[in-house]
Amino acid sequence: MAGREDGAAAGAMEEGQDSKEVKCESSEDGSSSSSSSRCHGNDVISVQFMQKVHPWCMCMNKNLLILAEILGTYFMIFAGCGAVVVNQSTGGAVTFPGICAVWGLVVMVLVYTVSHISGAHFNPAVTVAFATCGRFRWKQVPSYVVAQVLGSTMASLTLRVVFGGGGGGARGEHLFFGTTPAGSMAQAAALEFVISFFLMFVVSGVATDNRAIGELAGLAVGATVAVNVLFAGPVTGASMNPARSLGPAMVAGRYGGVWVYVAAPVSGTVCGAWAYNLLRFTDKPLRDIANTASFLRRSSRRS
């Protein structure tokens, strides 16, 4: 009897040792599995859970990203260009500093609103710059660019319907809220390149570096936009964004100098993103905006 009990105990111990390791593998159809274990002495009881991700859910997730970019770009253009239209139609009631403040504030608010959903690009140049640095998938670039241009065009159409601007005639000419160079094309291209470089340099610093204060990313980006509009607005309109220029141009049918507002912002943001990457002194992996670690979080953990 004692021998049988010893054999049974030894067998139980062997089974307990064999059950210590649990392997979880993902199935080929998109399902994922995890395990939960409870320990009693040397025995481990493992229970596996499997969660299947339906392709329809993955498709809906991608659609939500596109929708966030459309809505974000729409409200940004509607507020920013709307301030321009209201200022023109009311004889300067908003004032130029007020226009700068509107652009900066609306960008700040929208960054805080949808950055955790789509990244809050709202700008084809920013999307392309992120892709060149490996922070955004190239296969998603076309859908993002289309969404941003669509949002800008919809906002421009809304402003045209509400205020009657953007068309022909004296009133349409007066209320045009697109971007046109006040000086030469070379001057406009150079200035758009510099302010786009500056914008993307700031975005790369506050929104993608895991050592930055991530909670202040929206404030920093919005302030940068306001500063750029303040000193470059009278010369070029301070576009920094091909979608911001293409939307009003397509609605009004005015394409003079539009190539400047496509080529200069794209080249400027790409150079700005790479310039910051050269200054980055860390071997840690790059993180998405939603997962950005910050100085404030690290300080709270230390305390």
UniProtKB/Swiss-Prot annotation:
GO CC, any one term: membrane
Topology relative to the membrane: Multi-pass membrane protein
PROSITE patterns: MIP
Main location, first listed in the record: membrane
Pfam families: MIP
InterPro entries tied to this protein: Aquaporin-like, Aquaporin_transptr, MIP, MIP_CS
Molecular function in Gene Ontology: channel activity
Keywords assigned: Membrane, Repeat, Transmembrane, Transmembrane helix, Transport
Localization of this protein: Membrane
Motif annotated as NPA 2, chain positions: 241-243
Cited NCBIfam families: MIP
Family: Belongs to the MIP/aquaporin (TC 1.A.8) family. NIP (TC 1.A.8.12) subfamily.
Domain notes for this protein: Aquaporins contain two tandem repeats each containing three membrane-spanning domains and a pore-forming loop with the signature motif Asn-Pro-Ala (NPA).
Alphabetized PANTHER family for the sequence: AQUAPORIN NIP1-2, AQUAPORIN NIP2-1
Listed name of the protein: Aquaporin NIP1-2
Gene designation: NIP1-2
